[in-house]
């Protein structure tokens, strides 16, 4: 039980004991039992707020971080706690980082009841938190308890030795060597995506206007992207293509949408779950969470059925290593222990990779000059060939810049909270146990002191080295002082295990889209990132796709 829960219940029992003493030994006897119950409730309702207020004021006054700069305090009770859950996620933290300097590389602000938050604002502090001392911190208990509903008992919800041990089971599957083997499957899935778009264009009525000599249609892009990336997740997890892009296994697609679609009710429940003691939170009824539990049960049953069917086959490797085949070959397979990991891989394909690819396609549509540059690079790289070799996608500097710059501006996770589980330090500054640490990819990725005055603007050139005009190459850090300044995939020992897979799929999908379609925004609507965990565009977000002619004149 959390320390806060224990303190609240202790106050309640002390109040009850005090009333017992008054009635048993001092002769203060109420005329009926209702007065006794009322007295207990009154005692509890008075003592609890007084205790909380006293503790809050004491913690704020005695804070060892009061000398650190941060946003202006709003009030002494809950202060900036709701800025953590703002929408779009991390917007306020990004503004705070850019509005002033932080000489020590640390920002400080208070949250609910005097809880303290430290946000590293430079790469030195980030390296310590994410790499050097990464296991001095854990995801908050309330977050882990809530995320079990989405991911099960998996890498997302695990910590310390269990997390470290299970992370190693992912590495052989998601390392660059295995992803190289999977690349043809990623290209094939990207072509299925394009075929789906083309099928929509085929159904365009005669009255639909033509653009650039090709058919055109407005496409709900987010739904289609999530189908493709969810299929990819199942290929790496189980060696099974769900083929949701072809209209199959839509029951799983609907279940994931039920879990991850963001709405007002879910946001309120998420905030309450993080702020209230667990025993109070459980008393609040929620139809939304009941439907989420049904979706979770459906997904568990579906994954178990697919896993058992795959294990019944004689060959489970499918020409590449999957998470399931790796566990079986290693002799570590345990049905109950790893079912959550399999679900998480598919869920990450649906939510994290799906959101990332959706935003890259949006940036392609919103930056027409960049789209033209990518198309020109692809045309020149093919040298008359029908298609590129698999390893060529990863060597194209403009394509790489298109993907990296889009992911920089739209990281999957805007803000990640950690809690110090032991006394530690950041850049020599003492961090007591229990302090909350805010890792803010959105703010770091858009910090002017790290990326320059145009940090919040789209700029392909920051990722391209043109020192040799005839042979431009990729610039790994985008001009930032350290790789830790680009947090779209995290950094260090707790970084995203699926980075190589995500980059390989996104590059191929963008290249094949640009070769076949011209993409435009339909209106001035901006896809504000939203979501309980990963940041995604709205499910109804749409872009215009128009077929382009093959060849140089399509540019």
Predicted regions and their residues:
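Conserved cytochrome P450 K-helix E-x-x-R motif and the immediately C-terminal K′/meander segment
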Residues: 82-98, 305, 386-427, 550, ...
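Cytochrome P450 I-helix active-site segment
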Residues: 183-187, 209-215, 251-260, 317-324, ...
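C-terminal helix/juxtamembrane-tail motif
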Residues: 1-4, 536-555
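Conserved cytochrome P450 K-helix/beta-meander segment immediately N-terminal to the heme-binding cysteine loop
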Residues: 439-476
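N-terminal membrane-proximal hinge/A-helix region immediately C-terminal to the signal-anchor transmembrane segment
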Residues: 2-165, 187-192, 243, 295-298, ...
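Cytochrome P450 heme-binding "Cys pocket" and the immediately downstream C-terminal segment
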Residues: 199, 368-370, 481-482, 495, ...
